[in-house]
Amino acid sequence: MENTTILTDKEFEIFNQFSQKLNPNTKHDYLSKIVLMKAFLEEKDLLEVTKYECNEFIDYVKDKYAKSTCEKIYSYLHSFYNFMNKKKYIEINPFTYVKKPEVSRIKTKDDVLSVQEINKLVEILPKLNIRDRVIMIFLATTGCLLNELVNLKWKDIIMDEKNNTYVRLGKNKKERVVKLHPYCFKLIEDYRDYSGLSEVILPTNDFVFTTQKSNSITDRNVRLIVKKALDYAGLSQYSAKDFRHSFAAISLRLGADEEDIKKQLGWSDKYYAIRYKYVLNFVDSESVDYIMNNDHLSINNK
């Protein structure tokens, strides 16, 4: 839990106004970034910081965190200060004068798991509890975002008249329905059985993934689960986001249409595929997108 007590009553009141429409996980994420900056500034009033102090803070996070995290911290704080400027709490947004950390969107072979590496993950599944097994296979076979997995509810799992199973992912313009791999659904059934839930999946608003202390799970929980699994498999160089990269790159390498990948991953633009063009010559000639027809992926023997 973040130490929110270092925020003044006024700062916390402003944050609550700013975060009214955010979901709980996003709200917590924003708050953690604001508290981080407050701590760095030795609890100086956030309404009185200068562009120089903001720049020093961004330099600090660039030395401490990954580039993508630095970009996120900058974007969150820029948004928060824009809100304060718009509501006349401050005269100007100091982050306007701070250079945004740049992150390359081009993916390389270091961002992509090979089929052999995915097989290594499958081999270590027995070391994980049933919930964590479902999470790992779900990430590997759907290409979903972490927040989509975290927010998954039982009503999002669909079965057609031929007993094919699908999952509804995303919201609004990014909402899409993708097919579940049979082994992924088998694990989901095992997970329900272990959790004492009925065999029939009812369309409830309950979250699919929970913890012993909560009826939901957080992004951080998932990252820790993925890290543990990757460490077991000797693949600690990867992280949770690399499952999505792998899904996209390997599918494109096998010749999947950019429009199909756009729909599967919820991209707003099919030309996001350009991000992956440099990796296509390095990945295996198998596709996670079509793993149900792939004899080289051990998941199909489960």
Where are these regions (language model features)?
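C-terminal secondary-structure termini that scaffold catalytic or DNA-interacting sites
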Residues: 1-5, 291-302
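N-terminal core-binding DNA-recognition domain of tyrosine recombinases/integrases
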Residues: 9-25, 31-108
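DNA breakage-rejoining catalytic core of tyrosine-based enzymes
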Residues: 90, 104-120, 173-183, 199-205
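Basic, Lys/Arg- and aromatic-enriched nucleic-acid-binding interface segment
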Residues: 106, 118-146
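Conserved tyrosine-mediated DNA breakage-rejoining catalytic core shared by Y-recombinases
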Residues: 147, 151-187
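C-terminal catalytic core of Y-nucleophile DNA break-rejoin enzymes
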Residues: 170-190, 204-225
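Short, basic (Lys/Arg/His-rich) helix/loop patches that form interaction surfaces
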Residues: 223-263, 267
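Catalytic-site neighborhood detector that most strongly recognizes the C-terminal catalytic loop/helix
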Residues: 265-290
